[in-house]
Amino acid sequence: MRATDKKLKVACGANTGYLADSQWIGDKTPPTLCDVRVSPNNSVKPNIGAGELAEALNRVLPFTAKEDNRPILQCVKFAAKDGKLTLVSADGFRLAVIALDYDDGEGQALVSRDDLKGIANALKRAKRARVSFERSGDSLDGMSLILDTELIRYKWRSMDGSYPAYEELIPTEFNAFAHFDAIEAVKAVNSLKVPAFSKAYPIDLTFGNGKVVMANPDDKGQAELNADTGGEAIKVRLDGGYLVQALKVCGGMVDFKITNSYSPTLFSSNGYQLVAMPMMTSEASEQAKADREAKAKQAEAEAVTQAEAVAQAHTEAAVLADEQGDEATEDIEPVADKPRRKRKVREPVAVA
């Protein structure tokens, strides 16, 4: 590429064209804060695998928010800490998290998903990659994310704002789990999509006895998968499109864990985690209501038990104090009675 008379010369094979300044920008072109520098001899000391980072981006970008009124959730969070570079994305219904080995300091930045489009493909062709963070702007907490390859340097200034505390949204306790082939599961879900005749189609999943059973809610179809299963027999309903997307991103063998029919579910594969909210059904609503009432009764019973324990402790303390008082009285020797002196009583004096 060569600048000539304020135009950009673009050569592709035998074709050559010229673009004037701002000619490629339209009314709907979104603004960007990305700086791109191209150099055929960019010296790069790699600190992360280019292909590994490209795969990580492809696994988190699909789960950023599409709505313009949620700009923070339209970003991918990059956070380097404790020898890991963690990429996080969320859209309010799903949360994707993946951690890569990274031992080159600490930092974090929020980068818009629009600025990251095409970066994964560029990284697949790069031989070396380096990720770093640097201070930017006037604020003390302003940060920029820098990605260097042997040809190009990308620099994104972090968007201002606080990302949700995603760690609290990842479930840690489960009552049922299954380990199965994600590719076979995608085929099973696609076979159930045909009788649904709709883009939005729910899928009921139940696993136990070494099988994962997928079915349409109206019993129009059912598919079974061999799997390693454990725990209780719980049925959960997921959006079919969300389920297929989750399985494709996980790829290979996937672990699927659930707590109950209304709590967040967890897909995991080789360090990658995807949290997906289930669809609410009448059964799930009833179970949630029953669980809330049970927890309320348990909390009430624990409060009563605690109050009784406190009362019992007070009673025991009072009895112990009385016993100690009696023992102290017994230790005192009786003193002989002495005659008491009579006190003089003064007559009242009249005041004029």
Sequence positions of predicted segments:
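Structural preference for solvent-exposed beta-strand-turn elements
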Residues: M1-A352
